[in-house]
């Protein structure tokens, strides 16, 4: 059966905020958390008008009158001050300058190493033999123990020339010989021999052409 045109369907009336006006309070409600009176009534996002929603400016929290407390903080905090930005920028600049100084210090180390290598090279090239390096660490230029150009006969229990308590008396051939190089021991000639009596090693020098 068709409905009559004059008959209208009942429409549902949406609740409005006029039915629940905000409470007229002489003084704002204190915050239930911090007891601060810097609170306000929330006109927006106040879905349950039977429990009006409030906001505390001190602790930045919402709460509903007659409801439970919410521990959810307000999103989107305040902007950072310019002083904090300047402080962070200065800290970054200081760290970058310190890192550059460290790099500068490390680049100066190879120069010192090259100088020491050059010094050692000059010492080797100046003496001209490996035996000269043995006397670099001694206090008297290698004259104590015969590690350099010195003879060191007494310190090594060999004795000077003319001392008969040792046994074989080495005779150095010439005036420029080293401790380990002698020219003649008891008639042995034509080569170089070690000066120690128990470690006599002869090195024959044959004229090979």
Curated annotation (Swiss-Prot):
SS bond partners: none
Region of interest: Disordered: 1-29, 70-116
Localization per record: Nucleus
ZnF start-end (Dof-type): 29-83
An annotated GO BP: regulation of DNA-templated transcription
GO MF annotation, one: DNA binding
Binding site for Zn(2+): 31, 34, 56, 59
Biased composition (Low complexity): 89-116
One Gene Ontology term, aspect cellular component: nucleus
PANTHER family: DOF ZINC FINGER PROTEIN DOF1.4-RELATED (PTHR31992), DOF ZINC FINGER PROTEIN DOF1.6 (PTHR31992:SF312)
Protein name (database record): Dof zinc finger protein DOF1.6
Organism: Arabidopsis thaliana (Mouse-ear cress)
């Amino acid at each position: 059966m068709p409905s009559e045109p004059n008959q209208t369907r009942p429409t549902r009336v949406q609740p409005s905020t006029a039915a629940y006006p905000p409470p007229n309070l002489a003084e704002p409600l204190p915050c239930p958390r911090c007891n601060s009176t810097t609170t306000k009534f929330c006109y927006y996002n106040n879905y349950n008008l039977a429990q009006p929603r409030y906001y505390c400016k001190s602790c930045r929290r919402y709460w509903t009158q007659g409801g439970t407390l919410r521990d959810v903080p307000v999103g989107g905090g305040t902007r950072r001050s310019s002083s904090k930005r300047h402080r962070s920028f200065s800290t970054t600049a200081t760290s970058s300058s310190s890192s550059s100084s460290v790099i500068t210090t490390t680049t100066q180390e190879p120069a010192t190493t090259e100088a020491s290598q050059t010094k050692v090279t000059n010492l080797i090239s100046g003496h001209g033999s490996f035996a000269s390096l043995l006397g670099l660490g001694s206090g008297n230029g290698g004259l104590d123990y015969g590690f350099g150009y010195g003879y060191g006969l007494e310190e090594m229990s060999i004795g000077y020339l003319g001392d008969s308590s040792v046994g074989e008396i080495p005779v150095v051939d010439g005036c420029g010989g080293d401790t380990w190089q002698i020219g003649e021991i008891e008639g042995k000639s034509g080569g170089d021999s070690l000066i120690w009596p128990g470690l006599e090693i002869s090195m024959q020098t044959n004229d090979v052409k």
